Curated annotation (Swiss-Prot):
Ca(2+) 1 binds at D197, D199, N201, E208. InterPro entries: EF-hand-dom_pair, EF_Hand_1_Ca_BS, EF_hand_assoc_1, EF_hand_assoc_2, EF_hand_dom, Miro, Miro-EF-hand_domain, MIRO_dom. It comes from Gallus gallus. It is found in: Mitochondrion outer membrane. GO terms for molecular function: calcium ion binding; GTP binding; GTPase activity. Belongs to the mitochondrial Rho GTPase family. It comes from the Eukaryota. PANTHER family: EF-HAND CALCIUM-BINDING DOMAIN-CONTAINING PROTEIN 7 (PTHR46819:SF1). This is Mitochondrial Rho GTPase 2. Ca(2+) 2 binds at D317, D319, D321, E328. It catalyses: GTP + H2O = GDP + phosphate + H(+); ATP + H2O = ADP + phosphate + H(+); UTP + H2O = UDP + phosphate + H(+). Its EC number is 3.6.5.-. Homodimer.
């Protein structure tokens, strides 16, 4: 909505333009009228719409043609004033003033016009009969107001309608020639209907209508008022009411009726509540609310975000099979301008046996978006109507910003639930297969239905009895690490082909260049263990290299099996990411059991000492 309104008064000499302005300001008819009034600003707090309003007079005798064109260009709305007692001033509306204001403008860019019939105190009847053909000819005319500067009749109403024409314009909503909603308005209202239809049955029930009414206007409708609304729709449409609820056609008809009856501010209130601007586009303030992400922190969905998304999943799972089919997913995204997820989705998250998107996979995908691209996540939650449907100020309340990673390392603990693992290795080392194995897919299953490749996979892993999300990001062997942030992650997985004598040297080089002096835990993985092992190029063996650099020995891995691949390596990666402050070697099995044995020995020693003290006291 515009932050201020600029009203320009035009018309023939002596029609009373200046008198109208002075009558509004002085609240009395001026005895002496100057040729032209100075520009007047009405403060926001004294206007009905709480918007500052500038009123500009025009005098043909004092201003040039160029000055007039400048004022027209600055105006938000033009009031063309005529004398109800002089038909010549009415004729000039058609032949002079409207062509001057909007002659070269296209329909969508025309300035709204209010026709003002002044000096109604001098005429018994009305000029509306003569004015109506002009209003029908020019669609930019919002309304016509008959008034009297002398009697102060309809003066404030005149400027209210002028304000309204700017703040709640008809032109973007309604085509008066076709007598129907414009396509952009119809699309916006259809989206609003679909968001408000919380059980996805294509009907707004009384409860849904009242929730909608309260959300937009602050109060629910009284039961009788609700029945009256449905009765009006039922009488005027063939399919507007169904099962005692409002259909989409009924909802669109109701808004058309508001506009036709001059109550387009009602439709604008609805549109603006759902984030639309004057061009019927969702505003940046709505889609991208202010959100600060400090360096070293990450973003995760919180319980509010997950609850909201789970409700929407269940709403669109029409057959209640616990998965979204392609058609159901398309319906889910019908409130978006375009489909935000491509076919690579099915190689990014877990799917059902039939290849459909499960609830688990659905929530994993949203977790991935929230972590990798928080701006896009906010945008998507905005399209889904999160602030309105969750009764929150903005979609930022569906997200949590984690503590800075540096502090986690200092304190030796973290509250984070999502971790990023970069998977690095030479071409052909098995990185893509490793990512797909994380989704439970063996090499045979991957070959049967390859699908669209994805550089990411995400799944959940249990770490010390807690569920964590682990994101695997496959880094191409051709990737150039130009800055430290390119290698940044929570854990690095360096994968090499056990059967390729040159494969390990690539991983060793990457480790020494980018990870050796960092605090990022690293895990080496020897892939394709089902193939004969090849001797690596001269130098340290993989096991010796890991020992030298205080790393756990390479983990042996193969996804060439009949059943789903093993998950131990992914648990190991998630554990390393969760506890980066521990020495990586401590993640090895031998070290773990050594610590268990030491702990048991210490416990036994304390117990024995305590026994001796107690025995002595006896």
């Amino acid at each position: 909505m515009k932050r201020d309104v600029r009203i320009l008064l035009l018309g023939e000499a002596q029609v009373g333009k200046t008198s109208l302005i002075m009558a509004l300001v002085g609240e009395e008819f001026p005895e002496e009228v100057p040729p032209r009034a100075e520009e007047i600003t009405i403060p926001a707090d004294v206007t009905p719409e709480k918007v500052p309003t500038h009123i500009v007079d025009y005098s043909e005798s004092e201003q040039t043609e160029d000055e007039l064109q400048e004022e027209i260009a600055k105006a938000n709305v033009v009031c063309v004033v005529y004398d109800v007692t002089k038909e010549a001033t009415i004729e000039k509306i058609r032949t002079k003033w409207i062509p001057m204001v909007n002659g070269g403008a296209e329909k969508g860019a025309r300035i709204p016009i209010i026709l003002v019939g002044n000096k109604s105190d001098l005429q018994m009847g009305s000029s509306m009969e003569v004015i109506l053909p002009i209003m029908n000819q020019f669609s930019e005319i919002e309304t016509c107001v008959e008034c009297s500067a002398k009697n102060l009749k309809n003066i404030s109403e005149l400027f209210y309608y002028a304000q309204k024409a700017v703040l709640h314009p008809t032109a973007p909503l309604y085509d008066p020639e076709e007598k129907q909603l414009r396509p952009a308005c119809s699309r916006a209202l259809t989206r609003i209907f679909n968001l408000s239809d919380q059980d996805n049955n294509q009907i707004l029930s009384d409860d849904e209508l009242n929730y909608f009414q309260k959300s937009c206007f602050g109060n629910p409708l009284a039961p009788q008022a609700l029945e009256d609304v449905k009765m009006v729709v039922w009488k005027n449409t063939t399919d507007g009411v169904q099962d005692n609820g409002l259909t989409l056609n009924g909802f669109l008809f109701l808004n058309t009726l508001f506009i036709q009856r001059g109550r387009h501010e009602t439709t604008w209130t609805i549109l603006r509540r759902f984030g639309y601007d004057d061009e019927l586009e969702l505003t940046d303030d709505y889609l991208y609310p202010q959100f600060r992400l400090p360096p070293g922190c990450s973003t995760e969905l919180n319980h509010l975000g997950y609850q909201f998304l789970q409700r929407l999943f269940e709403k669109h799972d029409k057959d209640q099979d616990g998965a979204l089919s392609p058609a159901e997913l398309q319906n889910f995204f019908s409130v978006f301008p375009c489909m935000p997820w491509g076919p690579e989705l099915y190689n990014t998250v877990c799917t059902t046996d039939k290849g459909l998107l499960s609830l688990h996979g659905f929530l994993c995908q949203w977790t991935l978006i929230a972590y990798l691209d928080v701006r896009h996540c906010l945008e998507c939650l905005g399209y889904l109507g999160y602030p309105i449907l969750s009764e929150q100020d903005s979609q930022t309340q569906a997200l949590t910003v984690t503590r800075e990673k540096r502090i986690d390392l200092e304190k030796g603990q973290t509250q984070r639930n999502v971790f990023l693992c970069k998977v690095l290795g030479a071409r052909g080392a098995g990185k893509s297969a490793f990512l797909q194995a994380f989704l439970g897919r063996s090499l045979a299953a991957q070959r049967e239905s390859p699908g669209e490749p994805s550089p990411y996979t995400i799944n959940t892993v249990q770490v010390n009895g807690q569920e964590k999300y682990l994101i695997l990001h496959e880094v191409s062997a051709e990737t150039q690490f130009t800055k430290p942030s390119d290698a940044a992650c929570d854990v690095a997985c360096l994968i090499y082909d056990l059967s390729d004598p040159k494969s390990f040297s690539y991983c060793a080089s990457i480790y020494k260049q980018h990870y050796m002096d960092s605090q990022i835990p690293c895990v080496f993985v020897a892939s394709k263990t089902d193939l004969p092992e090849a001797s690596q190029q001269p130098g340290l063996s993989p096991a010796e290299f890991c020992y030298k650099h205080c790393l756990p020995p390479p983990f042996l891995f193969s996804c060439h099996s009949q059943g789903p691949p093993g998950t131990a390596i992914y648990t190991k990666l998630a554990t390393a990411a969760t506890f980066p402050h521990l020495n990586a070697v401590e993640l090895g099995a031998a070290s773990f059991w050594l610590r268990v044995a030491l702990g048991a020995a210490v416990t036994a020693l304390v117990g024995f000492t305590l026994y001796r003290v107690l025995a002595k006291n006896k």
